Amino acid sequence: MIIRSPEPEVKILVDRDPIKTSFEEWAKPGHFSRTIAKGPDTTTWIWNLHADAHDFDSHTSDLEEISRKVFSAHFGQLSIIFLWLSGMYFHGARFSNYEAWLSDPTHIGPSAQVVWPIVGQEILNGDVGGGFRGIQITSGFFQIWRASGITSELQLYCTAIGALVFAALMLFAGWFHYHKAAPKLAWFQDVESMLNHHLAGLLGLGSLSWAGHQVHVSLPINQFLNAGVDPKEIPLPHEFILNRDLLAQLYPSFAEGATPFFTLNWSKYSEFLTFRGGLDPVTGGLWLTDIAHHHLAIAILFLIAGHMYRTNWGIGHGIKDILEAHKGPFTGQGHKGLYEILTTSWHAQLSLNLAMLGSLTIIVAHHMYSMPPYPYLATDYATQLSLFTHHMWIGGFLIVGAAAHAAIFMVRDYDPTNRYNDLLDRVLRHRDAIISHLNWVCIFLGFHSFGLYIHNDTMSALGRPQDMFSDTAIQLQPVFAQWIQNTHALAPGVTAPGETASTSLTWGGGELVAVGGKVALLPIPLGTADFLVHHIHAFTIHVTVLILLKGVLFARSSRLIPDKANLGFRFPCDGPGRGGTCQVSAWDHVFLGLFWMYNAISVVIFHFSWKMQSDVWGSISDQGVVTHITGGNFAQSSITINGWLRDFLWAQASQVIQSYGSSLSAYGLFFLGAHFVWAFSLMFLFSGRGYWQELIESIVWAHNKLKVAPATQPRALSIVQGRAVGVTHYLLGGIATTWAFFLARIIAVG
């Protein structure tokens, strides 16, 4: 008789047909809430409808149902992303000068939008070179298309159609996984399987397939393009994939196939998997062979990482065990209890993810200019400035979002009864020490950083330049930053074998790289001016963190309002009869944090814009003389507040202010309009609810007189709604103003 061990049961991880598909229900506004579904009595109804439509916590308290809604919504999000991408590729296929740009990227600007001749607006179609008239784009799509090996507008058209198919597929998946086969809660909480798929699947196989595409398609096509071959003469991508001899003509070791790989003779592949560092002097971008090598290495790391966690086979790490093994000398039980928080509160999980993704986005912003990844990106100054600014704003918003969801977690998902003495509890118990120390740091940084500028303005005003903090008088050199730069500049040849240049030309040491008479990149000198503005960065970042962290740590209770958790995430004040308790909700901290985030990012992008125009961007003569756009005035002008106002804001605004009558005039209109949107926000931020309610009742009286009064009673915005509308217009107006100012300037002079 053979005794077999019992077969492991296969877990059923989906429910079939859990929720019927009902168009009648979807057609009813507010179907997710009993109160809202009744329809409007007052105009507040439309605000509540928008506030709660995606607040799945308010629809149900069942974690499984909430998880399914979030999961389904993610597919909707992906569908929109594919739709947007399809639109970008379609514009490239149908309305752009991509093929012309590809044949001469140094003299022709990228354009993918041609304005129709209505009311004379065709003036916006500027001459971008090569006889093409259109709006210059600054998204970097042309550069990424060239890097990926796209050589014709037909290929863009096919990709656009493919993206539409994927958009439809994602919409279907969102419906299918909510209405037809919805995952159970256990599936959402199986973190090891999730890590397996995300690390090995998305990141590992994703990077591997991109590396494969780069080696087999991008590298050979870019090799031909760099050599000046007409794009129409270059073989099509599938020919390189199917015909190995074609590749072997460019990279002889291809003839040997996979033999060197299996015989561990990997150096054979060093023709197309390189480790050079620095920039390709032809295109001013990173070496594409370095990039292919990088993605192959990343793929291997993530394929290994994806197999480190215990799934169906009972081998490998468990995340809960790893977390609970982490104990420091001062942390008591260590990370015990964190696993339960992160698998039962999606807000806590989202908060961590937003904080990391936001930081990563800001890191991307800094790498896009210091290690420009795509061909001819570094010399397209308008695109460089746009990419930096865009990624900085996005990163700022994501980090504020991290604080918002951390606070929502504290209010809605935190259970103090079973959280006793874990790490989070220990942080909360000494929150006063954290916040008061952080407050001291903010005061110190604010007074000292601003004080250095005020000193310089005063000395400058009194005609005492020898007493100013500057590179030519009292020097405050950023010695630590210079040491880091120097270390990196000396690194090649010492760290990685065969590396000929440092990771970025900005570190120093290397020569400058110029493409078509324009500077791509050169060593960036740091001096007193940078020291001063970096301390302003430190100040604004710390204040933003102070506001956001105070909102999180005091989200449930404070000395002022011990029962804050009962009032919820957003509330205007602690009821009538308790003065001085307004603006204390966690939501209000996010609201205030947004303004300081805007402050912080504005200083960063202003610093970047001026520094690059002054010390990096410019033209180079045949004799090798570099002429920078603003002639190196950053070091001496940016050390006073007056210098920032006079030589940056005012001097560089001339292009946008004088843009009327030119192809840049749309930026002039946007500059004006966005200032108006910004000013409009102040009406919401500086006036109270009662003022508007009085006005509304007077207007309603007039409507009653004329017998045109609506059935839905008009109401003034609530305090929280007013603040939300205010901060939205403040940020939108401010960002659009900056966008118009930057682009009109850099397109005109860059």
Curated annotation (Swiss-Prot):
P700 is a chlorophyll a/chlorophyll a' dimer, A0 is one or more chlorophyll a, A1 is one or both phylloquinones and FX is a shared 4Fe-4S iron-sulfur center. GO terms for biological process: photosynthesis. The keyword Chloroplast applies. Chlorophyll a' binds at residue 675. The keyword Glycoprotein does not apply. It is an enzyme of class 1 (oxidoreductase). One of its GO terms (cellular component) is chloroplast thylakoid membrane. It is found in: Plastid, Chloroplast thylakoid membrane. One of its GO terms (molecular function) is 4 iron, 4 sulfur cluster binding. It is a multi-pass membrane protein. Chlorophyll a binds at residues 683, 691. Belongs to the PsaA/PsaB family. NCBIfam families: psaA. PsaA and PsaB bind P700, the primary electron donor of photosystem I (PSI), as well as the electron acceptors A0, A1 and FX. PSI is a plastocyanin-ferredoxin oxidoreductase, converting photonic excitation into a charge separation, which transfers an electron from the donor P700 chlorophyll pair to the spectroscopically characterized acceptors A0, A1, FX, FA and FB in turn. Oxidized P700 is reduced on the lumenal side of the thylakoid membrane by plastocyanin. The PsaA/B heterodimer binds the P700 chlorophyll special pair and subsequent electron acceptors. PSI consists of a core antenna complex that captures photons, and an electron transfer chain that converts photonic excitation into a charge separation. The eukaryotic PSI reaction center is composed of at least 11 subunits. This is Photosystem I P700 chlorophyll a apoprotein A1. It comes from Olimarabidopsis pumila (Dwarf rocket).
